A protein has these predicted regions:
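A short, sequence-level motif marking secondary-structure junctions
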Residues: 103-108, 123-129
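Conserved small/polar residues in nucleotide/adenosyl-binding loops
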Residues: 138-140
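Extreme N-terminal "head/tail" segments of very large remodeling/mechanoenzyme assemblies
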Residues: 1-118
Length: 140
């Protein structure tokens, strides 16, 4: 079983230049709720536009190099800052720690096993083949 430990994002979709983190390592279950302050933050129960889908897209982007939804990679970069997008996913499988760092503008692709960086190919182009090979080996 895979245990997602944490996810950090910067300049990804609606997340700006200040790094935001979601820690999944606290309990067996993580519930993500949001309060849309743009709509007054009242008791109407409005949960749209608070970043829940951004979390799912960031998980997909970290693992597979593309959002789960049909968004082009360049459109994942926060439009206000237009650079420095970085998504970091830290997870564990069978007692082994893994970390994937993936970003654009500039392109970043790093893969770590037990905090040891693995050699990547064509990192400057954000090529995900080697990362996908590693992920396939651990059955993700």
């Amino acid at each position: 079983m895979i245990k997602i430990k944490d996810l950090t994002v910067r300049n990804f979709m609606s997340v700006g230049n200040q790094t935001q983190a979601v820690n999944f390592n606290r309990e067996q279950l993580t519930l993500v709720l949001g309060e849309n302050l743009d709509q007054g933050g009242d008791d109407s129960g409005s949960r749209n536009g608070t970043g829940k889908t951004t979390i799912i897209n960031a998980l997909s982007y970290a693992l597979y190099g593309q959002a789960l939804t049909n968004i082009k990679r360049n459109n994942l970069i926060n439009k206000t800052n237009s650079k420095g997008m970085l998504v970091t996913l830290h997870f564990e499988k069978n007692g082994v720690d893994y970390r994937v760092e993936r970003g654009r503008s500039p392109n970043v692709l790093k893969f770590f096993v037990d905090e040891q960086e693995q050699e990547m190919t064509d990192e400057s182009q954000g090529d995900s083949r080697k990362t996908q090979e590693y992920l396939s080996l651990i059955h993700i």
